[in-house]
Amino acid sequence: MASEDLREYLEAARQRRVHEQDARKQEMAARHEARRRDFDARSEPLNVHVVRVLEGARADLAEAGAKLEYKFHSYNAGKQLENPRVEFQIAGVGSPGTASSVYVIEIVQDGQVVVRTKRSFGDPDTTLTPHGSAPRTAASLKDVGLTDVIKAAIDEYVQHGG
């Protein structure tokens, strides 16, 4: 009888452990999904408008002998990016050494847009420096906000001999 009670106790303990693990997995999955939905919702201004404007600027700059490269970052839990962002840089077609900084446009939690710069695409976020631009919101990207940032990148590119 004692061995049967022990067996039942062990089985009940195993079942509790399995249920606790399942509950933790479901909680983590729900948190992950909520973060992904929030990230996607805040990405909307970048997805639709910014990429269209950058593509237009890319075509215009190609006619002028320069190239615009950009990288749009989508949600990836492994990268630990909290905010949607797009990075772009303007460089010469023939001389890649002449280039602007990499401009990083990021939409933070409260809908504010933060513009920062770093030297190259591979540089870590610890090297980001604030860009001296006016405070923006995601909605202002659809007006002249993004164009101003692209113009600043073009000005920097020209100053570096582009």
Where do the model's predicted regions map?
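Intrinsically disordered, low-complexity regulatory segments enriched in Ser/Thr/Pro
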Residues: 1, 80-144
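Charged, low-complexity eukaryotic segments
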Residues: 1-26
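Contiguous, amphipathic alpha-helical segments that mediate oligomerization or scaffolding
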Residues: 17-68
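Long, charged, glycine-rich C-terminal linkers/tails
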Residues: 61-83
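Short A/G/S/P-biased low-complexity tracts
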Residues: 152-156
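Extended, compositionally biased alpha-helical segments that mediate assembly or anchoring
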Residues: 157-162
